[in-house]
């Protein structure tokens, strides 16, 4: 059956709802966005993305164009709200809908061994949750809890967490529900606010970044998680090999 035309709110309005519900001020959202850009710019300078990037031939593109390492809180503060006249969600503290592509190869242990492929990581657990579509941004909260429980580990066991940054307000709402999570390990190389959110590719992208960062740090456990605009969340726990 067809879905009703007006059955939920636009994604940006959903971010405004979360900002209001969790008391996330505009300045806090802008600071989160600035951190995303600064971390992504630092990661590019340190060539931490080199192992996971495949350049596009032709007019060669080998770097995300939306990273603005030179932005500032003043620059972000000058941007007008997009979804409400007196709102807090702007183009600067939201993810850009970049073009992009990502691919991962999944195989069972026997198949990988037979092909002589050395796995980068093992999927330990995954979970999907459902929430009120108006509050889609907190979908990762329950999904993450279930995935951790299924993997038999806790927040303190994680070495890296990749939380997709659809909006700063959305990501901060999730973090507010995870007080036991060390924020220093969340998106250490920046997130979608800086790197972009190519719909259909972001899940594979954050999973790829997660696995490479786990191996770079010598950490064992990691999680990739994201909200889904129609009222869901998804989380995957991986173990680096």
How should each PLM-predicted stretch be described?
Residues 1-17, 22:
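Flexible glycine-/small-residue-enriched beta->alpha junction loops
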Residues 13-16, 124-194:
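Active-site pocket-lining segment
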Residues 18-25, 86-96, 127, 157-166, ...:
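Cysteine-centered functional microenvironments
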Residues 19-48, 103-110, 198-219, 236-238:
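Active-site-proximal alpha-helical scaffold in enzymes
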Residues 24, 48, 117, 153, ...:
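Helix N-cap/coil-helix junction residues
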Residues 28-114, 180-185:
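N-terminal extracellular/periplasmic Venus flytrap/periplasmic-binding protein-like
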Residues 74-138, 142-150, 208-209, 214-221, ...:
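Condensing-enzyme catalytic core mediating Claisen C-C bond formation in acyl metabolism
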Residues 155, 173, 177, 182-187, ...:
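Internal helix-turn-beta structural module
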